[in-house]
Amino acid sequence: MPGISIHVVDISRGIVARGMRAELWSAAGDGRFARLLEGEIDDRGVLAHPGLDQIFAAGRYRAVFHVGPYYRSEGIASGAHPFLDVVHFDFGISVPEQHVHLPFKCTPWGYSCFRGGA
């Protein structure tokens, strides 16, 4: 099944990051990025957006995770300048027919994102 799936887990508390805002962008030929879609992480920890269930052309993409606002809304991060605020993760698609799964694991102080196997 082609497409992109994004799964977000707040590993500092061992729960999915329900309510975190996430976006997907694509790179244009001039190197600038254009937003394709955005939404919030659901109760399963997934960015459920119909735009993710398509074949994405080969190229450069950017997943954007609003970590700081999420932790502020949860009462965990405070202050005007959290350590992590908005995280950009750039990745490429070489084979459009393959599914790309992006597991994003975060705390208020760090994150991990990689190509998963789901």
Segments predicted by a language model, with ranges:
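Beta-strand-dominated extracellular/periplasmic modules and repeats
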Residues: 2-90, 94, 101-103
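Compositionally biased low-complexity segments at domain edges in trafficked proteins
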Residues: 94-118
